């Protein structure tokens, strides 16, 4: 299972909204858990100023409650600390935290799958930005987009 987040802008004074200092985005973060095929198993939307390491625990719990065959979890450096300990100690799973080494762009093994899933979402007009007032509606739109992708055969084309 792979977990990552994406920060998106939102216009509305909705349920949860915050400023992500590192990415300079005022809006929300989408946490998703996907399998190695890029299929979405869990979604959690929250204010962008909340830490990934804490909010990642929520999406991990949602996904792992339904999945019995997961052997490990991959995430990036934003998930060190609380998330790492929660999954390793609470769920008794191997956790692989990937990190960059050196300068420039590098394709990280397995991590590109979750990034590809986010790029598929950007092909959906409704998900290019967070237009929803509450986070549950935003989560529902992500699930609908992933179902649409499955029905069409793994692409939005």
Where are these regions (language model features)?
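Intrinsically disordered, low-complexity segments enriched in glycine/proline and serine/threonine
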Residues: 26, 132-136, 142
């Amino acid at each position: 299972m792979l977990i990552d987040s994406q920060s998106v802008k939102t216009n509305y004074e909705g349920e949860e909204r915050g400023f992500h200092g590192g990415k300079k985005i005022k809006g929300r973060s989408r946490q998703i858990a996907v399998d190695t095929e890029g299929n979405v198993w869990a979604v959690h939307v929250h204010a962008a100023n909340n830490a990934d390491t804490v909010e990642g625990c929520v999406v991990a719990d949602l996904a792992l409650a339904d999945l019995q065959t997961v052997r490990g979890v991959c995430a990036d450096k934003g998930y060190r600390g609380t998330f790492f300990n929660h999954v390793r100690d609470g769920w008794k799973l191997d956790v692989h935290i990937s990190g960059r080494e050196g300068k420039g762009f590098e394709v990280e093994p397995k991590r590109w799958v979750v990034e590809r899933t986010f790029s598929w979402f950007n092909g959906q007009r409704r998900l290019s930005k967070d237009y929803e007032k509450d986070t549950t509606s935003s989560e529902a739109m992500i699930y609908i987009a992933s179902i649409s992708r499955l029905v069409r055969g793994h692409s939005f084309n």
